[in-house]
Design a protein with these regions (language model features):
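Active-site phosphate/pyrophosphate-handling residues
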Residues: 173, 250, 287
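Donor nucleotide-activated moiety binding/catalytic core segment of transferases
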Residues: 149-156, 189-197
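Generic signal for short, ordered secondary-structure residues
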Residues: 107, 153-154, 234, 257-258, ...
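Glycine/Thr-rich beta-alpha phosphate-binding loop at enzyme active sites
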Residues: 177-192, 209-257, 262-265, 270-271, ...
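Glycine-rich phosphate-binding active-site loops on the catalytic face of alpha/beta enzymes
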Residues: 134, 139-142, 187-196, 228-243, ...
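Short, conserved loop/helix-junction motifs that constitute active-site signature segments
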Residues: 199-203
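Conserved N-terminal beta1-alpha1 strand-loop-helix module at the mouth
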Residues: 1-181, 204-210, 221-227, 262, ...
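A general structural signal for short secondary-structure boundary/capping elements
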Residues: 161-164, 213-216, 254-257, 275-277, ...
Length: 311
């Protein structure tokens, strides 16, 4: 197939999917702007792959995600014996997500984790647990090992007598020692874990949550079969510097279709007024930080957000 024909296929993909995945209008709080990306070097010669690689880059997907999508589009084409520009890849087998050994999976979470509060201190964890927030995470930043151990132990104690599930961000050994419900790691922290460390977390019986920011990271997370997967950042956030642009609602919905075998958590810049659109994608949990931490009355804010989760 000639380059012009491959270009025409790429144009067709962009035409059919630009409304959802292209540069989106940003006139309201539910829209993000996605900038076309350079096309990465091709790794295989098939026309479907080449067209999808071009198209997904033009639709704003970074190189690793454009590559992941192009490979999936090629597998979809081979599996169905047709190249369908209208069908965005969403079958797990086309992303290599099938055939995992259930015995190696981390312990299960409820399919819907509900409102998920990400909180900086054990005191705030306890307050939100007592306010009825069903899932809480201690994101305690410190380089002092003793302070970390003390804060994690205090957080575990703070949720006792409540129904809250407590995840500890990053500090996996302290979480194991204190008997937390689970740990949550970012993608870089997951990559930094040695095999023996990951085995120790698995052997402890703790649940594992993993942050992801696109297709390639979701595939990477699936390799360890975590208890849940977080998807974000959905909207712009000032809390931490992100390596990727905000994902937006259309991408979030596509991620949910692909990863529905996992409990899923949407995170990143989500305010109460955006809960209906987020819930409509099918995620079973919405994580918030500022909406609780910066609220003048955190308990009242929690009650409002819990009501929003119920629709």
């Amino acid at each position: 197939m000639q380059a012009a024909e491959i270009q025409a296929l790429a144009d067709a993909i962009v035409h059919h999917h630009s409304a959802a995945f292209g540069a989106q209008l940003h006139h309201d709080a539910n829209s993000v702007e996605l900038v076309p990306q350079p096309v990465p070097p091709a790794l295989r010669p098939e026309p479907a792959y080449l067209a999808a690689l071009q198209a997904c880059s033009r639709l704003g997907f970074i190189a690793v995600d454009a590559e992941c999508l192009a490979q999936a589009w090629q597998r979809q084409t081979e599996r169905t014996n047709q190249f369908d520009v209208t069908h965005w890849p969403d079958a797990p087998q086309d992303f290599g997500l099938s055939g995992a050994d259930p015995a190696l999976a981390f312990p299960a979470c409820p399919p819907a984790l509900g409102l998920y509060g990400v909180l900086p201190t054990a005191e705030s964890v306890g307050r939100m647990a007592r306010a009825g927030v069903p899932t809480v995470q201690l994101r305690f930043k410190s380089d002092d090992a003793a302070a970390i151990r003390a804060e994690v132990q205090a957080a575990v104690k703070a949720v006792q007598g409540t129904q809250a599930r407590l995840f500890i961000n990053d500090h996996w050994q302290a979480a194991i020692d204190a008997g937390a419900y689970g740990i949550h790691v970012g993608q870089e922290d997951l990559d930094a874990l040695e095999g023996a460390q990951l085995d120790a977390i698995h052997a402890s019986g703790l649940r594992l949550g993993v942050s992801t920011h696109g297709y390639a990271e979701m595939v990477r997370a699936h390799a360890v079969q975590p208890s849940y997967i977080a998807l974000g950042a959905v909207f712009p956030t000032t809390l931490k510097r992100m390596a990727t642009a905000p994902q937006g609602l259309a991408r979030l919905q596509a991620y949910v279709r692909l990863m529905q075998q996992y409990p899923l958590v949407a995170i990143g810049g989500i305010a109460a007024e955006q809960f209906p659109q987020i819930r409509a994608t099918g995620v079973g949990s919405i994580a918030v930080v500022r909406a609780l931490v910066n609220a003048p009355d955190p308990e009242a804010a929690a009650a409002h957000l819990l009501a929003c989760m119920q629709g």
